[in-house]
Amino acid sequence: MKLLITDDEYATRSAIKHLIDPEKISFDEIFEAENYEEAIKVIINHRPQIIVTDIVMPVHNGITLIDWILQFSKDSQVIAVSGHDNFSFIKSTLRRGVVDYLLKPLDIDELNGALQKAVSRYEQRMEYYKLKKAGEVSE
Protein backbone atom coordinates (compact mmCIF):
# COMPACT_ATOMS: atom_id res chain seq x y z
CA MET A 1 0.00 0.00 0.00
CA LYS A 2 1.34 3.44 -0.96
CA LEU A 3 0.59 6.76 0.73
CA LEU A 4 0.97 10.29 -0.63
CA ILE A 5 1.01 13.24 1.77
CA THR A 6 0.43 16.61 0.10
CA ASP A 7 0.90 19.78 2.12
CA ASP A 8 2.80 22.98 1.46
CA GLU A 9 4.21 22.88 5.00
CA TYR A 10 7.08 20.45 5.60
CA ALA A 11 6.29 20.31 9.33
CA THR A 12 2.76 19.06 8.62
CA ARG A 13 3.96 16.40 6.16
CA SER A 14 6.54 15.25 8.69
CA ALA A 15 4.00 15.21 11.53
CA ILE A 16 1.58 13.09 9.51
CA LYS A 17 4.33 10.56 8.76
CA HIS A 18 5.28 10.37 12.43
CA LEU A 19 1.69 10.10 13.68
CA ILE A 20 1.00 6.94 11.67
CA ASP A 21 0.71 4.04 14.10
CA PRO A 22 2.58 1.06 12.57
CA GLU A 23 0.64 -1.25 14.91
CA LYS A 24 -2.59 -0.26 13.15
CA ILE A 25 -1.47 0.40 9.60
CA SER A 26 1.67 0.18 7.52
CA PHE A 27 2.59 1.53 4.13
CA ASP A 28 5.17 0.06 1.78
CA GLU A 29 6.02 3.52 0.49
CA ILE A 30 5.24 7.04 1.68
CA PHE A 31 5.60 9.89 -0.80
CA GLU A 32 5.48 13.60 -0.11
CA ALA A 33 4.41 16.49 -2.30
CA GLU A 34 4.64 20.17 -1.50
CA ASN A 35 1.97 21.30 -3.97
CA TYR A 36 -0.59 20.31 -6.59
CA GLU A 37 1.95 19.89 -9.40
CA GLU A 38 4.23 17.62 -7.36
CA ALA A 39 1.22 15.60 -6.20
CA ILE A 40 0.06 15.01 -9.78
CA LYS A 41 3.54 13.76 -10.74
CA VAL A 42 3.64 11.36 -7.79
CA ILE A 43 0.14 10.07 -8.55
CA ILE A 44 0.97 9.47 -12.22
CA ASN A 45 4.35 7.85 -11.53
CA HIS A 46 3.64 5.86 -8.36
CA ARG A 47 -0.14 5.33 -8.15
CA PRO A 48 -0.60 5.74 -4.38
CA GLN A 49 -3.75 4.09 -3.10
CA ILE A 50 -4.19 6.53 -0.20
CA ILE A 51 -3.76 10.30 -0.48
CA VAL A 52 -3.79 12.79 2.40
CA THR A 53 -4.03 16.35 1.14
CA ASP A 54 -4.14 19.76 2.70
CA ILE A 55 -6.97 21.90 1.38
CA VAL A 56 -5.36 25.33 1.61
CA MET A 57 -2.24 25.47 -0.56
CA PRO A 58 -0.86 28.20 -2.82
CA VAL A 59 -1.70 28.32 -6.55
CA HIS A 60 -3.90 25.19 -6.79
CA ASN A 61 -5.71 24.17 -3.63
CA GLY A 62 -6.54 20.72 -2.32
CA ILE A 63 -10.07 20.87 -3.75
CA THR A 64 -8.58 21.19 -7.24
CA LEU A 65 -6.36 18.19 -6.46
CA ILE A 66 -9.32 16.16 -5.17
CA ASP A 67 -11.28 16.95 -8.33
CA TRP A 68 -8.31 15.82 -10.47
CA ILE A 69 -8.00 12.59 -8.47
CA LEU A 70 -11.72 11.87 -8.90
CA GLN A 71 -11.26 12.19 -12.64
CA PHE A 72 -7.91 10.49 -13.24
CA SER A 73 -7.17 8.27 -10.22
CA LYS A 74 -10.65 7.17 -9.20
CA ASP A 75 -9.59 4.25 -7.01
CA SER A 76 -7.34 6.36 -4.79
CA GLN A 77 -8.87 7.12 -1.41
CA VAL A 78 -8.49 10.72 -0.24
CA ILE A 79 -8.36 12.22 3.24
CA ALA A 80 -8.66 16.01 3.40
CA VAL A 81 -6.78 17.97 6.06
CA SER A 82 -7.38 21.62 6.86
CA GLY A 83 -7.60 24.35 9.43
CA HIS A 84 -10.92 25.40 7.84
CA ASP A 85 -13.80 24.54 10.15
CA ASN A 86 -16.56 26.25 8.14
CA PHE A 87 -19.44 23.76 7.91
CA SER A 88 -20.41 24.48 4.30
CA PHE A 89 -16.77 24.16 3.22
CA ILE A 90 -16.41 20.83 5.03
CA LYS A 91 -19.71 19.59 3.58
CA SER A 92 -18.64 20.57 0.06
CA THR A 93 -15.37 18.66 0.49
CA LEU A 94 -17.07 15.55 1.90
CA ARG A 95 -19.61 15.54 -0.94
CA ARG A 96 -16.73 15.03 -3.34
CA GLY A 97 -16.31 11.58 -1.83
CA VAL A 98 -13.29 11.98 0.42
CA VAL A 99 -12.93 9.38 3.15
CA ASP A 100 -12.68 11.97 5.91
CA TYR A 101 -12.05 15.64 6.65
CA LEU A 102 -9.60 16.18 9.50
CA LEU A 103 -9.02 19.48 11.25
CA LYS A 104 -5.57 20.76 12.13
CA PRO A 105 -3.97 20.31 14.55
CA LEU A 106 -4.29 16.62 13.79
CA ASP A 107 -5.42 14.15 16.40
CA ILE A 108 -3.41 10.90 16.27
CA ASP A 109 -6.44 8.65 16.75
CA GLU A 110 -8.51 10.51 14.14
CA LEU A 111 -5.67 10.34 11.62
CA ASN A 112 -5.05 6.63 12.13
CA GLY A 113 -8.79 5.92 12.08
CA ALA A 114 -9.16 7.80 8.80
CA LEU A 115 -6.18 5.97 7.30
CA GLN A 116 -7.62 2.59 8.34
CA LYS A 117 -10.98 3.56 6.85
CA ALA A 118 -9.28 4.64 3.60
CA VAL A 119 -7.36 1.36 3.33
CA SER A 120 -10.54 -0.60 4.03
CA ARG A 121 -12.45 1.30 1.32
CA TYR A 122 -9.65 0.73 -1.17
CA GLU A 123 -9.52 -3.00 -0.38
CA GLN A 124 -13.32 -3.28 -0.69
CA ARG A 125 -13.20 -1.58 -4.07
CA MET A 126 -10.49 -3.95 -5.30
CA GLU A 127 -12.48 -6.96 -4.04
CA TYR A 128 -15.56 -5.66 -5.89
CA TYR A 129 -13.55 -5.35 -9.14
CA LYS A 130 -12.21 -8.88 -8.65
CA LEU A 131 -15.71 -10.31 -8.13
CA LYS A 132 -17.07 -8.29 -11.03
CA LYS A 133 -14.34 -9.58 -13.33
CA ALA A 134 -15.13 -13.14 -12.23
CA GLY A 135 -18.79 -12.50 -13.03
CA GLU A 136 -19.90 -12.94 -9.43
CA VAL A 137 -21.46 -9.47 -9.15
CA SER A 138 -23.36 -7.36 -11.64
CA GLU A 139 -23.44 -3.63 -12.07
Language-model-detected regions and their locations in the chain:
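Acidic catalytic/metal-coordinating carboxylates
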Residues: 35, 61-64, 82
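Alpha4 helix (beta4-alpha4-beta5 surface) of REC/receiver domains from two-component response regulators
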Residues: 64, 85-100
